Amino acid sequence: MEALRQRIEAAFEARADITPSTVDASVRDDVQNVINMLDKGEVRVAEKIDGQWHVHQWLKKAVLLSFRIFDNVVIDGAETKYFDKVPLKFAEYDEARFKAEAIRVVPSATVRKGSFIGKNTVLMPSYVNLGAYVDEGTMVDTWATVGSCAQIGKNVHLSGGVGIGGVLEPLQAGPTIIEDNCFIGARSEIVEGVVVEEGSVISMGVYIGQSTRIYDRETGEVHYGRVPAGSVVVSGNLPSACGKYSLYAAIIVKKVDAKTRGKVGINELLRIVD
């Protein structure tokens, strides 16, 4: 794996000179190998090691190289044709393979090859981009989008119209991460490498990027780029220092543990008790 990483790094440094017609066959094979490993979940752009998320930038470089190496081709769809560099993940699946991987894919759901979809996952008409990792038991609801290299944990619910931001460039940026057992409410957007920690509940219409203030009303603490584990979050605003205006913020209204989540429904958790 280390030798593969070094070859990808070297090819990326020379990317300005790489085109579909000039690329060396060995580089093409290395990049295709990485895409295949991402597709199978054998590697992932980010993984949690000793409680901390680590980003494997060389895998992102391989994904970016793929856009320089592979040319556009015609891709057959059920009701139309497409013209793109990245094939569709399920293009060669048959009934036996869908059953073996325990994936349910509703018509018009689009998943690009190089993204991993775990067992017992349901994909409503949605979009999962290249390099993404969607773990077991997750629901990607209608018109939800999982961006490039985003990491979605086990037993997550991405409600209708949710946007999970992608991140290929800038290269140093970390991917957006939704940890296990989270619920993301309809039309919410989590972007720019924000991490929503395990067991959190995000209400409908909450927008969180790196500059969004995430205010804990119980402690007065303000977080950036991270929703603490077990948070229940709604959209709101905070007053300016001068008191003349207010600006948007995400508000942590309460904290819940796994035991409470098991006993109480999502709708109940989102009811604010002053």
UniProtKB/Swiss-Prot annotation:
Binding locations of substrate: R104, D141
Using the record, list the residue span of the signal peptide; answer none if the entry has no such feature.
Answer: none
- Any GO MF annotation of the entry: 2,3,4,5-tetrahydropyridine-2,6-dicarboxylate N-succinyltransferase activity
InterPro entries found in the cross-reference section: DapD_Trfase_Hexpep_rpt_fam (IPR005664), Hexapep (IPR001451), Hexapep_transf_CS (IPR018357), THP_succinylTrfase_dom1 (IPR023180), THP_succinylTrfase_N_sf (IPR037133), Trimer_LpxA-like_sf (IPR011004)
What Enzyme Commission number(s) apply to this enzyme? 2.3.1.117
Pathway listed: Amino-acid biosynthesis; L-lysine biosynthesis via DAP pathway; LL-2,6-diaminopimelate from (S)-tetrahydrodipicolinate (succinylase route): step 1/3
What's its catalytic activity? (S)-2,3,4,5-tetrahydrodipicolinate + succinyl-CoA + H2O = (S)-2-succinylamino-6-oxoheptanedioate + CoA
Cell location = Cytoplasm
Question: Which GO BP terms sit in this record?
Answer: diaminopimelate biosynthetic process; lysine biosynthetic process via diaminopimelate
Alphabetically ordered keywords of this record: Acyltransferase, Amino-acid biosynthesis, Cytoplasm, Diaminopimelate biosynthesis, Lysine biosynthesis, Repeat, Transferase
GO CC annotations, alphabetized: cytoplasm
Class in the EC hierarchy, top level: transferase
Q: Organism's domain of life?
A: Bacteria
Matches recorded under PANTHER family: 2,3,4,5-TETRAHYDROPYRIDINE-2,6-DICARBOXYLATE N-SUCCINYLTRANSFERASE, MOLYBDENUM COFACTOR GUANYLYLTRANSFERASE
Subunit organization: Homotrimer.
Q: Name the family.
A: Belongs to the transferase hexapeptide repeat family.
Protein name, as recorded: 2,3,4,5-tetrahydropyridine-2,6-dicarboxylate N-succinyltransferase
- Native organism is Shewanella baltica (strain OS155 / ATCC BAA-1091)
Organism ancestry? Bacteria, Pseudomonadati, Pseudomonadota, Gammaproteobacteria, Alteromonadales
The gene it comes from is dapD
